[in-house]
Amino acid sequence: MPLASNPVAFLPSSTAHGDLPAAAFSRSSAGCLQLCRPLTPTSSLQCNAISRPRTEEYIDVIQNGLPVIKWHEIVEDDAEKDSPKDKVGELRDAVRSMLRSMGDGEISISPYDTAWVALVADADGDRPQFPSSLHWISTNQLADGSWGDHATFSIFDRIINTLACVVALTSWDLHPDKTHKGILFIKKNIHRLEEENVEHMPIGFEVALPSLIDIAKQLQIDIPSDTRGLREIYARREIKLKKIPSDILHQMPTTLLHSLEGMPGLMWQKLLKLQSEDGSFLFSPSSTAFALQQTKDHNCLKYLTNHLIKFKGGVPNVYPVDLFEHLWAVDRLQRLGVSRYFQPEIEECVAYVYRYWTEKGICWARNSEIQDIDDTAMGFRLLRLHGYEVSADVFKHFESGGEFFCFKGQSTQAVTGMYNLYRAAQLIFPGENILEDAATFSAKFLQQKRANNELLDKWIITKDLPGEVGYALDVPWYASLPRVETRFYLEQYGGEDDVWIGKTLYRMPYVNNNKYLELAKLDYNNCQALHQQEWKDIQKWYRNSSLGEFGLSEGSLVQAYYVAAASIFEPQKSQERLAWAKTAILMQTITSHFHHSAEQKRVFLHEFQHATGGRYKTTRTLVGTLLRTLNQLSLDILLAHGCHIHQPLKNAWHKWIKTWEGGGGGAELLVQTLNLCGGGRRNRWESEELLSSHPKYEHLLKATVGVCDKLRRFQHRKDCNGCMGSDGGIRMLDIEAGMQELVKLVVTKSPGDLDSEIKQNFFMIARSYYYAAYCNPGTINFHIAKVLFERVQ
């Protein structure tokens, strides 16, 4: 018995815990989905992508697939902890202010880079060119004598920052007390270098630290230079320097320009031709400061002077970071489920990125001659989602011999770079082979890292990177319902505790901050409280309509509402959400009740066609329940928006009833219901005739119905192992191709296009079918409990 004939049917009690097979998909070497063994409630989808929820606070037990809720506890808890509405408004205003004030990027100061700037002498050579940098160093030493990130202790970060600051102060014979404390910290802790996780080694650390030690020796600073950890660092340095192609370094822009301060034998006349437009060397203050020391170049001086003014004496480890900030802020807000509050600001962020998009990709800053796969993948994904035309061929610049890389010549692969490539590759259009290859490569890389428990990244120390990667691998984008992703990301996002790794640890306050997280938690709990009230209303409607007498279980009821609420969660979309849920519930009831009787089907259709309003006001028949529900939905829309949808809605049902015998048509009815019930909220009312005659509407409907029908038939033709038989007739390649075509229709814009919400409705319905086909019943039960009933703490 399949999970469901459509994505709104819940398993009966015998299968609520996964006793019967449910198919799972896994990505094949060709980049498409293939059938594999069924998932169980303890399989990777449930255990790796998502941790066990704290459902004991709200759920006694799952009986017959239905969470038994302690409603009184929820009500009391809400009353105690609910924040006032003005708190949400206050947080929205604060976040909006951040987004509107975005410029070159908000970023923390790097003591290491500031020290290199402080080392620069003026034209006469006997005074510091930038005394404000020395002042910053002198006023930002930590209590233990070190310099570095105040909240996260990394010995890599503390040692290189502290040694650089000690060197800078000593070179100008300033603050001997502070240098003494710094030296003591280094002596006490330098042995810990061998204990640190090498994945968190800062950029260029193995070259920069030995260079600083050499300078320290010249200044007669007494620090250890022969510990086991340092010997390993020096060995890494030799390997890296041998890999550096001197001719290429001086001929074309490479990532080596970011770390010039650690390299010997540089030919500055050639290197100056490779400066960025802003006068920097690949946006690195320390590299640029070293260049200024060696060349006295005016453009280097101008770059550093401008940023010293902005940061009041300090400098970051990299600047600007405008594209990085714009992209990652949008990504975080979307995944946290609060992007709807900031649509104008998000549109501006995405438009800003598009202004600097190139056919070779982008990096963290505008107008760069160097591109990286991380920023390019994030940019590609968000631009495509927002309707911009971006070619998948951009990823050909990051592929060689079937492998993908972040930078040419990189020494190690970053987990987050491959993670964002994997996410981007799922927005594939038909025929984009490069994205199939990218998905295959990145998925394999991430799966191997997960299997080896190596999901650490060289660019960020975050709260739960394994959870983020696990969710992406186990719940592909086609199956990822918005509220499900948000519910788990709320536990994975670390807010201001997440810290990035560059030449030193650094923070991006407009990307990682607690205001985003606090707003998202409040918003989620507010939406969840509304959903729980709607669920109680659905239960009351179910009882009053006697749907249980017609064979509909309460398990089917909760899944129908859950799928709708997890897809359309916004409070202002309550009417669409309830219309989706009730439509799905009635379809399931009618289909199952008349499954074995063709004569009963004909009678039902005849009664529906010839029904008059008064006759069915109180009768407890399926026809009566259906007519009363349509009347109520239509009346709700009329009162709220002044739109008459009763006849079009009844027409849609009539079409479905005539065709349901073949098992199809459910997706079309759901889409039509959503578009009719949601039309009143848009700026203009889209009539049934206008919608149905629009060429793109017809294409979207055909694509949606086609792929949903394949997914429905796929579920019905699984064999006892949860896998398709050889003659099943449904190729997963066809389903993937159908989803790709639908995504292209939904996200691309054209003259005279449909309203974006109408287009999104098609994808939401297809995604719900995909979700039902992909997830096993145990996982769905788990999601229901967590998304609908587990409050975010």
From Swiss-Prot:
Gene3D superfamilies: 1.50.10.160, Farnesyl Diphosphate Synthase (1.10.600.10), Terpene synthase, N-terminal domain (1.50.10.130). It catalyses: (2E,6E,10E)-geranylgeranyl diphosphate = ent-copalyl diphosphate. SUPFAM superfamilies: Terpenoid cyclases/Protein prenyltransferases (SSF48239), Terpenoid synthases (SSF48576). GO terms for cellular component: chloroplast. Signal peptide: none annotated. Keywords: Chloroplast, Isomerase, Magnesium, Metal-binding, Plastid, Transit peptide. Its cofactor is Mg(2+). It comes from the Eukaryota. GO terms for biological process: gibberellin biosynthetic process. CDD domains: Terpene_cyclase_plant_C1. This is Ent-copalyl diphosphate synthase, chloroplastic. The gene is CPS5.
